[in-house]
Amino acid sequence: MQKLSIPKGTRDFTPCEMDKRNYIFDTIRSVFYLYGFKQIETPALENLSTLLGKYGEENDKLLFKILNSGDFISKVNPIDWNNHQLSKLTKQISKKGLRYDLTLPLARFVVMHRNEITFPFKRFQIQPVWRSDRPQKGRYREFVQCDADIVGSDSLLNEVELIQIIDEVFHRLSISISIKINNRKILNGIAEIISEEKKITDITTAMDKLDKVGLTKVNEELLQKGISIQAIDQLQPFFLLKGSNQNKISTLKNILSTSPIGIKGLQEIETIFNKLNLIPTRNTIKFDLTLARGLNYYTGTIFEVKCLNVPIGSVLGGGRYDNLTNIFGLSNLSGVGISFGADRIFDILNQLNLYPNTNASHTQILFVNLGEKGVDFILPVLFSLRKVGINAELYPHNTKIKKQLSYAHNNQIPFVAIVGSTEIAENKITIKDMRSCSQFSIALDKLINFFQYERQSV
């Protein structure tokens, strides 16, 4: 027999695991609805012209590209083939790719459907994305993102609302977190005062790795990217900035006083914190100057969330993008959004055993199959139970009761109904409680009430 496997960085999920994952999705979805967001979906495939050049050079390398259909090799330029010109070859043999995230597809969606959309457009999306990353703990090549974005509004109240959503979702999931926020305008201001404006992408890419690789490695990378030693020395106080959120803001106002864009970013951060001070939040919200988020399209506030109890990397990221739809021809449309990493949240809940009882959606009663006469009696009963929302099954084969009870046990079905000739004659059903092994009879007209009560008591 062929040895079967799945690609590295991907996973199968059993029914039990899907119950847990749906608990996560349902929790996040319910909070999104609470704040007025509406759901959309976009294709797994996007044209490479939509995807390439928008994430930055490093992240472009992580795109999964799909070979063109048919005899695509015959259309390749022989010179590029013989000279191993991979970048040129890619354009000739691949026109489509798997989406890297849900933000660029959103920008494409907004531009294509702008005449159908009411702005501000509050959308959420729960779908898988793919990245050709090196698989490791907490890092997958296929994973689900749960995004919420507000497009068509530059109000900082949107940032405040998104932080409330973050706080509420993780509270409902019982996960303790730290919420980090920063502003790309502040980072631009820092690059400006150290005279390295043209190297802003290199600086922010390196800064974003500070938590992962440490200060020494970040400084080495900055040097390799051509940042001057003098500029790197000027960056050190920013890397090491400590104190309360307000103290950091006050300190930076003095340092960045000659940078209008830097001051603008500080004013935005300060406004967000002032509004948050009016609202009770359950988790720590920290102004972290080293938070950069590697994606090129962020222009204002940026978010990142980490779990305090499990070392697994970030479980949420996001930020404001003022120019994202510009690349598709629609200007002056600001947006801001967040993205929950559902797969890392799934791993955290597993590790901390934080899942509630998820059996409420399972089958509540299995009817044993004892033959044709019993089946004819059971089918109308099944219909009545399902009609009022009680999950019920009939075993499809007339086989040994032991086998049917084993099926109920393995599928965690709490009740088994036995209908023999006596039950049919008396219009009753014998119920076996699989949890306590007790057994009792119940009149047919009392069956629905019994299970509705059982469901409420779960």
UniProtKB/Swiss-Prot annotation:
PROSITE patterns, sorted: AA_TRNA_LIGASE_II (PS50862)
Enzyme class at the top of the EC tree: ligase
Enzyme Commission number: 6.1.1.21
Catalytic activity, reaction form: tRNA(His) + L-histidine + ATP = L-histidyl-tRNA(His) + AMP + diphosphate + H(+)
Pfam families with a match to the protein in the record: HGTP_anticodon, tRNA-synt_His
Keyword Aminoacyl-tRNA synthetase: yes
Subcellular compartments: Cytoplasm
Biological processes per GO annotation: histidyl-tRNA aminoacylation
Keywords: Aminoacyl-tRNA synthetase, ATP-binding, Cytoplasm, Ligase, Nucleotide-binding, Protein biosynthesis
Family annotation (SUPFAM superfamilies): Class II aaRS ABD-related, Class II aaRS and biotin synthetases
Presence of the UniProt keyword Cytoplasm in the record: yes
Domain of life assignment: Bacteria
GO cellular component, one term: cytoplasm
Subunit description: Homodimer.
HAMAP family: His_tRNA_synth
Family, per entry: Belongs to the class-II aminoacyl-tRNA synthetase family.
Name of the protein: Histidine--tRNA ligase
Organism in which the protein naturally occurs: Azobacteroides pseudotrichonymphae genomovar. CFP2
Gene: hisS
